[in-house]
Amino acid sequence: MAHYPTRLKTRKTYSWVGRPLLDRKLHYQTYREMCVKTEGCSTEIHIQIGQFVLIEGDDDENPYVAKLLELFEDDSDPPPKKRARVQWFVRFCEVPACKRHLLGRKPGAQEIFWYDYPACDSNINAETIIGLVRVIPLAPKDVVPTNLKNEKTLFVKLSWNEKKFRPLSSELFAELNKPQESAAKCQKPVRAKSKSAESPSWTPAEHVAKRIESRHSASKSRQTPTHPLTPRARKRLELGNLGNPQMSQQTSCASLDSPGRIKRKVAFSEITSPSKRSQPDKLQTLSPALKAPEKTRETGLSYTEDDKKASPEHRIILRTRIAASKTIDIREERTLTPISGGQRSSVVPSVILKPENIKKRDAKEAKAQNEATSTPHRIRRKSSVLTMNRIRQQLRFLGNSKSDQEEKEILPAAEISDSSSDEEEASTPPLPRRAPRTVSRNLRSSLKSSLHTLTKVPKKSLKPRTPRCAAPQIRSRSLAAQEPASVLEEARLRLHVSAVPESLPCREQEFQDIYNFVESKLLDHTGGCMYISGVPGTGKTATVHEVIRCLQQAAQANDVPPFQYIEVNGMKLTEPHQVYVQILQKLTGQKATANHAAELLAKQFCTRGSPQETTVLLVDELDLLWTHKQDIMYNLFDWPTHKEARLVVLAIANTMDLPERIMMNRVSSRLGLTRMCFQPYTYSQLQQILRSRLKHLKAFEDDAIQLVARKVAALSGDARRCLDICRRATEICEFSQQKPDSPGLVTIAHSMEAVDEMFSSSYITAIKNSSVLEQSFLRAILAEFRRSGLEEATFQQIYSQHVALCRMEGLPYPTMSETMAVCSHLGSCRLLLVEPSRNDLLLRVRLNVSQDDVLYALKDE
Amino acid sequence: MSSRKSKSNSLIHTECLSQVQRILRERFCRQSPHSNLFGVQVQYKHLSELLKRTALHGESNSVLIIGPRGSGKTMLINHALKELMEIEEVSENVLQVHLNGLLQINDKIALKEITRQLNLENVVGDKVFGSFAENLSFLLEALKKGDRTSSCPVIFILDEFDLFAHHKNQTLLYNLFDISQSAQTPIAVIGLTCRLDILELLEKRVKSRFSHRQIHLMNSFGFPQYVKIFKEQLSLPAEFPDKVFAEKWNENVQYLSEDRSVQEVLQKHFNISKNLRSLHMLLMLALNRVTASHPFMTAVDLMEASQLCSMDSKANIVHGLSVLEICLIIAMKHLNDIYEEEPFNFQMVYNEFQKFVQRKAHSVYNFEKPVVMKAFEHLQQLELIKPMERTSGNSQREYQLMKLLLDNTQIMNALQKYPNCPTDVRQWATSSLSWL
């Protein structure tokens, strides 16, 4: 793997390109493009929204990869900061070691994963961006090119959500492809121009060779924690730009015709990568986690002591992925000087940072920000989104051509500096690589303000990503679970309620309504409540989850402002007030008692604080949160009414009239009238759900599905029931099959049997299978009921009837004890309802079955 | 010489017999998973397939095993688990959690027990720390972390499942079923219960999450099978050390099962209850009568054991009462006849008794009132009479309303067998007007 020179001894200046797009609602100015200038060599990189960037982290050989979504200036605090919002990708080495096996194959050396983890903070300091990188999305069928020699290209095929690897969804795939294509379009004319400006002998292959050379040297370099972009980086960027249009052309046409796709890509990679990658290198990357602790100790020249002293808070800071601060910059410089003592000072392009430098840079930044003119405030309504997008595209195009022009002009300088730095790096001994990042990304949001003040470098390795130290986990199995072997097994897997479908059929309307509600609240930066009701198994929670998932994607694509999503479930609480504790913990990670948590939350939501992102709170099983004073419901629905809270509450319960039935007026008034009711599924909807799950799988006869759907629709309309019955039907089908390998089809008989098994009452069979004395006792009860005309009798009365019956049927005389045993036996099965037996003779007995059923069961002998 | 031979024979017998008794008692008292299953092959297959799918494929499931007491629910699940654990890939990959509704009487205790049995991180030694809320969120998080393919499947066995349904909000059941229906750690929830109306006990949300699989065990065998079970339960295993004795014993058992009187006993037992525990009880009593001098079970043993089993417990108590107490019971019986099951008090009973003593009887001593009161209270202690619930307050003891817990037929039957009963008392019992 290449060393990505991140912190060289030059410093970089970051400035915005283009006019800011001020958004009043968002309280910050957004930009389309950023320009990074490196001190000393007057090169510039232009980074645009939608491009893939490298971001410096604690592992310098594997800097973080992300897609730039938004550039903006955060001026909430006096020194305005350049911030960026990104969509992260993870490298395989960043995946926790214990989860790596989930991939189930060897990862490609340049494979990265779309990081689908909404809790991860995507808001970063723009000044940590190192440079550009190419990311090529692969369709699920594609093979990740393994022995590709072009290392500046990364491939994304799967997404990783901290739980499992999933193939990229088709929208995502298209989305990843799109920006490159558009960039290619923009750059096409420019490329032609730049090519003509270059010396004719420069073929792409040569470019690559040059770049690889630089990369080789870079791998030996000692990274220094300064932001500036080095000449090398500049060079790489330039090459990347040259390669880009060609590459994206390749991919775009490749995606049109799939059969030849892989071949072509491989061919291309061969052209661009003449040098072979060394095998040991790869091994090293695969096992950095193991070596990490010792290595950090080795590297930690001066800051190990600091680290030891660090308080827990500091440790949290340590784990965040941030640019090293200026103070550490200086110190690291100092520690490095002895190592790089053999360097030729004349070629060292780096400038050792001194306090004056920092000041100067700050001033420069401030100036740059002042220059940013404010555009008229826009209200970001849906209607205006389109126009805005058009404007953005225009701006991007303009910025692009301009930056390319600049690049062309400064090319020679870059070349010179490149070679010099190569030599310098060759002289430095190779240093052990740093520990891979094991950062908790969730924490970064709370640390915006501390970005520039912190004084530690992340060194702690192998920290769990969750903020909790003791991550509870069920032991993982030593042997992998078997995969479905037959069609029926596959069907069973898909029919399991837990199998998450790609889309929720038959709930499109409800989905749209909820989506619109939450989206409008997000766009308006207001709060609100919505009450969702419906009988169990109608897809309430699933629909809300789907909405949130879509909104999170939209937030990543920058269509809606980012938001925080919290979910609580009334049934998963031991006590209603625990809901405060859970919300607080999910919101801020704090732990507190219920009362304290309530205070903190009230403070957070009701006081005028710093602008925060909107919180979407899903309260499942709302009725469980009922208390006598109803203070919890009151609070939950009161917070959104505060202007500063920016809280959207989605409350789910079963009963439609819950607000009227159990809530006080002041609570139900705050809940408002935004209500939605999920109707039970009709039979055709259930049928559609089953069909969509069994798509392309011939396991069921159509009639069998229809029968199940009709039966369930008639009874409850519960989708879970429907799926469970079908699952059982596949089992019955499998049992009835004699030959295990014959492709059996679930017929109507099988589903009928499953339906009967699940819905039929067992009382009658129970009576039929009970002993003679039990049956005659039941007869005695019927006789006694008929005699007295009541539906209840004491044991004594029934006993006398029972004795008479036994005498008639020639059974031996039943003693009182025996009869009592019979009675309590029937009572324990709940065929009878009996009083506690301490009442003895006087205990009252009732039938729990209808008299007709008993008669039917007894007669049938 | 012959006497010595017989002596040594009897010695061998005592040894063998103690072994026989040990083996058989173990069989009767303990539900060992070694015993054979009968008549539940279909259910067994269903359950074991389900467990296998959870263990091998990581498919979550929930199932209820429903059947009356003594129908072999626990035996079925034990068998299935034993078979499951014999599969090599499974034995290390499956965690088991056993809960019992009678032990884990609320969710708090149940959660601690689950955490302890799963040996999660907050278990120190044998204790689980943290509050109820913490434990719940801890456990839920632990289970949420896993997924189908990589986590160890957990099998939850909830004995006396109906009692869990009475826990507050059914939190535990909701969460278990919710996990079984969502893509988390694969779990199998197996509930054992004897209540046929169990589904009505579940709250609607809990019910919706339950997969509605029910395995019914109904004791659906007939009398011939019952006799077969009897034989099977009583026969000695092939690996019994003394082969000769075992052969003889088994022959005897075969002979017994064909004996008419034995079959009558068994038929009677079968009529009362198909519960195998009651059969075990009968056999246990019969087994206790086997001694060195009487090494093989006979039909008489079984008949006497059966009599012991079907004894009326209250009649037995009546046999041990004093004459005065018997007289009081008879007085109460008459009161019941006169006032048609209305409750009575001590004073009424005393008056009735006085009438009998003064008019006719000379055999019964005219006891003083406190003595009679004492006898009355003794009857109450034996729970042959029971105070009415409402009037337990501050009324005087003499006037507290009571009810008799003996049936007329019971009293008459008991008097028949009562030793040394005075004739006039017996006469008085048959008719309250006998002194006229």
Curated annotation (Swiss-Prot), chain A:
The associated disease is: Meier-Gorlin syndrome 1: A syndrome characterized by bilateral microtia, aplasia/hypoplasia of the patellae, and severe intrauterine and postnatal growth retardation with short stature and poor weight gain. Additional clinical findings include anomalies of cranial sutures, microcephaly, apparently low-set and simple ears, microstomia, full lips, highly arched or cleft palate, micrognathia, genitourinary tract anomalies, and various skeletal anomalies.
Annotated region (Necessary and sufficient for ORC complex assembly) at 501-861
Q: Read off the PROSITE patterns from this record.
A: BAH (PS51038)
Q: Tell me where it mainly resides.
A: nucleus
Q: Which SMART domains match?
A: AAA, BAH, Cdc6_C
Give me the Gene Ontology terms describing cellular component: chromosome, telomeric region; cytosol; nuclear origin of replication recognition complex; nucleoplasm; nucleus; origin recognition complex
Residue sites binding ATP per the record: 500, 534-542, 621, 654, 720
Record remark on domains:
The BAH domain mediates binding to dimethylated histone H4 'Lys-20' (H4K20me2), which is enriched at replication origins.
Report the protein name in the record.
Answer: Origin recognition complex subunit 1
Query: Which Pfam family is an annotated match for this chain, by its short name?
Result: BAH
Q: The BAH domain covers which part of the protein?
A: 45-171
State the function annotated in the UniProt record: Component of the origin recognition complex (ORC) that binds origins of replication. DNA-binding is ATP-dependent. The DNA sequences that define origins of replication have not been identified yet. ORC is required to assemble the pre-replication complex necessary to initiate DNA replication.
Q: What is the effect of changing residue 720 to Q?
A: In MGORS1; abolished ATPase activity
Key word Ion transport present: no
Q: Which family does it belong to?
A: Belongs to the ORC1 family.
Q: In this chain, where does the modification Phosphothreonine occur? A: 203, 337
UniProtKB/Swiss-Prot annotation, chain B:
What disorder does this protein's entry note? Meier-Gorlin syndrome 2: A syndrome characterized by bilateral microtia, aplasia/hypoplasia of the patellae, and severe intrauterine and postnatal growth retardation with short stature and poor weight gain. Additional clinical findings include anomalies of cranial sutures, microcephaly, apparently low-set and simple ears, microstomia, full lips, highly arched or cleft palate, micrognathia, genitourinary tract anomalies, and various skeletal anomalies.
The protein's name in its UniProt record: Origin recognition complex subunit 4
Modified residue N6-methyllysine is at which positions? Answer: 7
- List the gene name: ORC4
Q: Quaternary state and partners of this protein?
A: Component of ORC, a complex composed of at least 6 subunits: ORC1, ORC2, ORC3, ORC4, ORC5 and ORC6. ORC is regulated in a cell-cycle dependent manner. It is sequentially assembled at the exit from anaphase of mitosis and disassembled as cells enter S phase. Interacts with DBF4. Interacts with POLQ.
This molecule's function is given as:
Component of the origin recognition complex (ORC) that binds origins of replication. DNA-binding is ATP-dependent. The specific DNA sequences that define origins of replication have not been identified yet. ORC is required to assemble the pre-replication complex necessary to initiate DNA replication. Binds histone H3 and H4 trimethylation marks H3K9me3, H3K27me3 and H4K20me3.
Cell location? Nucleus
Classification of source organism: Eukaryota, Metazoa, Chordata, Craniata, Vertebrata
Q: Which family does it belong to?
A: Belongs to the ORC4 family.
